Amino acid sequence: MLIDKTNISNIRREYISGQLRHTDLTNQPIQLFSVWLHQAYFSKIPDPTAMCLATVDHTGQPYQRVVLLKNFTNKEMIFYTNLSSRKAMHLANNPKVSLCFLWNVIDRQVIITGSVDKLPEKEVLKYFYTRPKNNQISTWVSNQSKVISSKDLLENKFLEFKKNHLHKKVPFPEFWGGYKININSMEFWQGGTHRLHDRFIYQRYKHTWRIYRLSP
C-alpha cells in the first residue's frame, strides 16, 4: 500500500533519546565525534559510517550522495571514490564540501564543512588492496556516473573481468583515488523534546576551536 500523501504532514515523533549539554562537550570536536560514532555503531545503526556528501558543480548547482567514511584524524575525514565520477569533477572545480551523518535511531546528526585535498597514491594503493576482491573488480567495470544501456552490460563485464583475474591480482586503477576533508566546522545536533533540540557548533579559529550553542 502506498503512503497517503495527505498524511505526510502528520508524520512526526518526539525525540526522547537524551540531551547534549555544554558539560558533555570535548575540547576537540573529533573527540565528541568519535564518541558518537562509537555509540552509533553499538546501537546497531545500519551503516554508521555512511555520510551524505554535498558538492557543487560549475554552475552552482549542489548535488548530494552517500559515501562511506573510511578514516578520520583530529583534522580530517577520509573517503575514496572514482576520480572520473561526477563528485570528483565537482571537487576539481570547487574543493568546498559539506558532510552530514544522520543517526536517527539515537536522534543525532553531525554536519561538517571543509575543503578537500587528494590523498597521496601510496595511501590510496594501500587501502585499495584491503577491499574485497569483488569490490576491486567493480571499480574497473563501472565507469562511474556515465550513462549505460543496461544493468546486464555491467554484470557481464564484471563476470568477464572476474574470470580473467580468477588467479591473478587485480591491477590498481589509476582512475581511483581518495580525498581528505580538512574540517572547518563541525555541528552536533541532539534531538530534544518539544523540538527544543540541542545544537553546538565548533568553528575553527587559527589553531583552536570556538564553540557556540545554536538555537534549534
Swiss-Prot record:
Keywords: Flavoprotein, FMN, Oxidoreductase, Pyridoxine biosynthesis. GO terms for molecular function: FMN binding; pyridoxamine phosphate oxidase activity. Substrate binds at residues 12-15, 70, 127, 131, 195-197. It comes from the Bacteria. GO terms for biological process: pyridoxine biosynthetic process. Its EC number is 1.4.3.5. PROSITE patterns: PYRIDOX_OXIDASE. FMN binds at residues 65-70, 80-81, 86-87, 109, 144-145, 189, 199. Binds 1 FMN per subunit. Its cofactor is FMN. NCBIfam families: pdxH (TIGR00558), PRK05679.1 (NF004231). Belongs to the pyridoxamine 5'-phosphate oxidase family. Homodimer. This is Pyridoxine/pyridoxamine 5'-phosphate oxidase. It comes from Blochmanniella pennsylvanica (strain BPEN). The lineage of its organism: Bacteria, Pseudomonadati, Pseudomonadota, Gammaproteobacteria, Enterobacterales. The gene is pdxH.
